[in-house]
Amino acid sequence: DRRLTILTATFIPCGAKLPVIAMMGGVMTSYATGSYEAGGLMAPCMYFIGIVAVLVAAIILKKTKPFSGKPAPFVMELPQYHIPSAKTVLLHVWERLKGFIIKAGTILFLACVVMWFLSGYGFVNGSFGAVEDPGNSLLAVIGGAIAPIFAPLGFGNWKAVAASLSGFSAKESIVSTMGVLANITGDASEDAVTVAEAVRTWFPSAVAAFSFLLFNLLDSPCLAAISTMAKE
């Protein structure tokens, strides 16, 4: 039961997937309303889909040999509840903040640098160097080679595929990769809409955008989650 829970719990959207849900939700609603500001309404829907995916996956896995058998009894002894001290609260806050800073300063930063390099350099006329057209970049070559695999899902665009691939290292890097590929500069509040407008051109319809969102919701978790699952 513990292994089953570990494997299926990843279908529930984590905090790292919320920016992707907000971005793609805005893209999807723009097809119907013309506005990119209603994307937050997709979050409850994605959580509901995640819960359904957990139930379906658990039922299917329970019928397989590695997870079959009688459920093990679960006993948890809870200590008495106490009001936490300020020191304890601050220590827990610092641990979470430190973990995020380390993740943002290592995995996310390196992922953005790698995506920037791959999208800014490539081979033109037989020589390697900086490219003005992202379509001639190394990332376009890699994404274009893999894109046909994702074409049946509705997003055979190399930029969408590249953004999805970056999510395997950290889900937070999906939106940042979209920003890099969209060549966004300027005010951040305006950039959010500009990125969404650029991303919309990657998908032929709202269904394709939903397919992209659903794929990144239910695909393999990030490296940090996989390493934690292995330890458990």
PLM region spans:
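Juxtamembrane helix-loop transition segments at the membrane interface in multi-pass membrane proteins
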Residues: D1-T5, A9, L61-L78, A225-E232
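Extended, low-charge hydrophobic alpha-helical regions
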Residues: D1-T5, V113-E232
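Alpha-helical transmembrane segments of multi-pass inner-membrane proteins
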Residues: L4, A9, E37-I49, A53, ...
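Transmembrane helix-loop junctions at the membrane interface of multipass transporters and ion channels
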Residues: F11, G15-A43, S227-E232
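Hydrophobic alpha-helical transmembrane segments in multi-pass membrane proteins
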Residues: P13, K17-L18, A22, K103-W116, ...
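Hydrophobic core segments of alpha-helical transmembrane domains in multi-pass membrane transport
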Residues: G25-M28, M46-K62, L108-G120, F212-N216
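Long hydrophobic segments that form regular secondary structure
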Residues: S35, K62-P71, Y81-G129, A147
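Juxtamembrane inter-helical linkers in multi-pass membrane proteins
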Residues: F67-H92, L139, A182-T194
